[in-house]
Design a protein with these regions (language model features):
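Long, highly charged amphipathic alpha-helices
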Residues: 2, 6, 37, 65-68, ...
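Active-site-proximal structural segments of metal-dependent nucleotidyl cyclase/transferase enzymes
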Residues: 34-57
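Conserved helix-loop-beta segment at the catalytic/binding core of cyclic-nucleotide signaling proteins
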Residues: 59-60, 66-101, 110-123
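Interdomain coupling helix/linker and adjacent catalytic-core signature
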Residues: 22-41, 61-66, 101, 105
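A short glycine-enriched loop-to-beta-strand structural element that forms part of the catalytic core
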Residues: 50, 80-96, 118-150
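Flexible, glycine/charge-rich interdomain/linker segments that couple
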Residues: 14-26, 126-133, 152-155
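Signal-transmission/dimerization alpha-helices at domain junctions
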Residues: 1-18
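Catalytic cores and conserved motifs of cyclic dinucleotide signaling enzymes
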Residues: 47, 61-68, 100-104, 133-155
Length: 155
């Protein structure tokens, strides 16, 4: 029952996910599908989910910070790593977690930035965090807005 429902859900989401993939080169299918699934879950049950983005600007520690951010991922999170010439971006979907989980994630990130890179604030490490809640807004629009805020897409 559960596996069949999950499979049927995936089949329904594929066309919508393909549109997200066409509009966002490099976006993993798993990321797009999970975002759409969580949008539906929120619409049907009101359960929150969140997305965070860490934009790591060019600095001598940029590659090390990005690598550590990837290592710090939680097991259930789904991520999209974007590598650009002047910055790296780690976008993380936090399924079924709202504001409190985002706050905890950002505090943990700030703590390891301080411990490992001696950066007391995000801006000391040239890291800019962005967050978004999965809500009534269509998943594609939510992602587009987040990418615009991260300066990946033009508004």
């Amino acid at each position: 029952g559960v596996l069949l429902g999950y499979y049927a859900d995936n089949v329904k989401l594929i066309p919508l996910a393909m549109k997200i993939l066409r509009d966002n080169v490099g976006c993993p299918l798993e990321f797009a599908s999970e975002l759409l699934r969580l949008e539906r879950i929120h619409r049907e049950s009101g359960l929150p989910s969140s997305i965070t983005a860490l934009v790591i600007s060019d600095s001598p520690a940029r590659r090390d910070i990005f690598a550590e951010a990837i290592r710090q991922r939680r097991q259930l999170d789904i991520s999209w790593d974007i590598r650009l010439s002047d910055r790296d971006i780690l976008i993380t979907i936090m399924p079924l977690h709202g504001d409190a989980a985002v706050t905890g994630y950002l505090l943990r990130t700030q703590r390891w930035l301080q411990e490992m890179f001696n950066a007391t604030k995000f801006m000391d490490a040239k890291v800019t965090p962005y967050t978004a809640l999965v809500n009534e807004r269509p998943a594609e629009e939510l992602l587009t807005n987040l990418l615009e805020r991260c300066l990946v897409r033009q508004a």
